[in-house]
């Protein structure tokens, strides 16, 4: 965060990197993590930060590109060792429609010994554009929402491994119903997509409806 109270930093490059790594590690479990890198000028960094905020609150804004890949099951322990990946256990439940233009879901997320709960709503406009809003909720509200669950869909359990390399953010979703495959998400600006070493990509599934979360809730397979 930028403010006028920060002291000047005079540490070596190595120490600066160590501090930045610790900061990223501390925030890596946050459900709305965005990495604003130093590859652009200060003004562009501010613009990227503003765009990230708009994205989080569900307002139309230029969003980072998002690519999705079907991958061979990675060595999750190696992800932690090699990339300092943070593992987050999640359970996502889709709710019955009350508005045909609004998809609703709730998520239970385990952070260490604590559980967090979120309500998410994805709305689609008549022009085809959509935005997503998400807010934290109490355990009591979460349980109440579960009573509105879509009975035609399964709850989706997964462990999400989050890490960053350079200006890009990576997420790997591992599901209990698949022992051989997982899903890799790559977030970042630009068309070129650098994939982490040690990850075997089977194919890109960015626009494949079969690998959307709602489809996985229906078929429970990769």
Map each language-model feature to its residues:
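Long, hydrophilic "mature protein body" segments
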Residues: 21, 30, 36-37, 61-62, ...
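Short amphipathic alpha-helical segments, especially helix-boundary/capping motifs
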Residues: 26-27, 122
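Phosphate-binding beta-loop-alpha motif at adenosine-nucleotide cofactor sites
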Residues: 30-48
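Phosphate-end processing signature that detects enzymes handling 5′-triphosphorylated RNA
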Residues: 43, 51-222
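Short, well-ordered coil/turn elements that cap or connect secondary structure elements
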Residues: 28-30, 206
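A glycine- and Lys/Arg-enriched "phosphate-lid" helix/loop adjacent to the NTP-binding pocket
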Residues: 1-26
């Amino acid at each position: 965060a930028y403010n006028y109270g920060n002291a000047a930093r005079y540490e070596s490059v190595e120490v600066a990197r160590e501090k930045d790594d610790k900061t990223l590690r501390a925030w890596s479990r946050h459900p709305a993590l965005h990495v604003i890198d130093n590859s652009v000028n200060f003004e562009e960094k501010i613009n990227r930060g503003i765009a990230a905020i708009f994205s989080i609150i569900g307002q139309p804004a230029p969003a980072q590109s998002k690519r999705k890949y079907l991958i061979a099951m990675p060595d999750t322990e190696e992800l932690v060792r090699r990339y300092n990946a943070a593992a987050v256990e999640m359970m996502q439940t889709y709710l019955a429609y009350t508005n045909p233009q609004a998809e609703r879901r709730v998520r239970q997320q385990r952070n260490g010994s604590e559980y967090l709960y979120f309500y998410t709503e994805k709305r689609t406009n008549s022009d085809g554009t959509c935005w997503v809003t998400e807010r934290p909720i109490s355990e009591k509200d979460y349980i109440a929402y579960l009573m509105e669950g879509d009975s035609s869909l399964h709850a989706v359990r997964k462990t999400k491994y989050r890490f960053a390399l350079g200006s890009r953010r990576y997420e790997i979703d591992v599901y209990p119903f698949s022992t051989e495959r997982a899903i890799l998400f790559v977030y970042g600006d630009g068309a070129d997509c650098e994939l982490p070493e040690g990850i075997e990509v089977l194919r890109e599934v960015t626009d494949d409806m079969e690998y959307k979360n709602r489809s996985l809730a229906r078929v429970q397979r990769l």
